[in-house]
């Protein structure tokens, strides 16, 4: 500021700068579990476009999830990158700028396809937890619901691995449907994972999926076929509504539950399902 004033001799005396003062009650500051740092962006978020998930970067669950996930070596020798704070992947990547082959070194360790954020985690987890309607409400609302269930907990290695594997199946199915030019694949993926989890969620060999670090075709192919049938069923019955809006209604969930779509074969013969 001093340097600026030395170079600029204009009169700035009449310039007004808006200032927001947030007053926090002493009782609130002294209450158990109050995180002062986490409350600053929440109090300041009146005009800026800050997303709900951005305000939870300091929640201990996500801090520990990030720490564990960054330390888990995969069978491929690379790592998953959980983006606890928006833009952290690029920020970490930029640290390698200037180094010889720096960006390649970073992306070899943390491949772009193995980066996911808090909303990805939330939407996927809700579907596996049999809450597809919540997942279909949008990334931020889905995150708020997921956050309520985890913000007071600390994840362990087993939970982190399982949630990453769930995201791996979720995102791989979505990518497969996109490759086949399916419209609004996320909605169909939400309900496909819901149906799959409803029957097999507690029987999947997550340690096998983690070791493989990809979705085996014996699961991905029938899951893709399930998604196609589900897509047809929903579109035939949604009337004039947009599929992403219809998917938020009880009517859609009831329709999916009533749909006569067999899940027995070939899932029952897969070595990844016990």
Predicted regions and their residues:
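Accessory terminal alpha-helical modules
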Residues: 3-274
């Amino acid at each position: 500021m001093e340097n600026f004033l030395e170079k600029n001799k204009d009169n700035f005396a009449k310039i007004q700068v808006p200032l927001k003062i947030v007053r926090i009650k002493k009782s609130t500051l002294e209450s158990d579990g109050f995180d002062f740092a986490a409350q600053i962006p929440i109090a300041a978020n009146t005009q800026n476009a800050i997303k709900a998930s951005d305000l939870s970067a300091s929640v201990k669950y996500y801090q520990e999830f990030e720490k564990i996930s960054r330390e888990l070596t995969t069978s491929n020798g690379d790592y998953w990158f959980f983006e606890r704070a928006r833009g952290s992947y690029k920020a970490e990547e930029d640290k390698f700028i200037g180094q010889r082959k720096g960006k390649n070194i970073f992306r070899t360790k943390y491949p772009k396809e193995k980066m996911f954020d808090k909303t990805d985690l939330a939407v996927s987890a809700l579907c596996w937890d049999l809450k597809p309607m919540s997942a279909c409400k949008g990334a931020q609302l889905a995150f708020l619901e997921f956050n309520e269930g985890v913000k007071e907990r600390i994840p362990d290695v087993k939970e982190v691995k399982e949630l990453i594997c769930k995201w791996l199946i979720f995102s791989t199915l979505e990518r497969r449907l996109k490759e086949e030019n399916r419209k609004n694949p996320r909605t169909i993926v939400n309900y496909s994972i819901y149906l799959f989890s409803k029957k097999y969620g507690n029987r999947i060999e997550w340690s096998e999926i983690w070791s493989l670090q990809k979705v085996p075709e014996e699961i991905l192919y029938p899951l893709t076929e399930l998604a196609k049938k589900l897509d047809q069923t929903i579109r035939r019955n949604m009337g004039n509504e947009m599929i992403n809006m219809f998917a938020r209604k009880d009517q859609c969930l009831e329709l999916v539950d009533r749909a006569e779509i067999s899940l027995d074969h070939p899932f029952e013969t897969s070595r990844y399902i016990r």
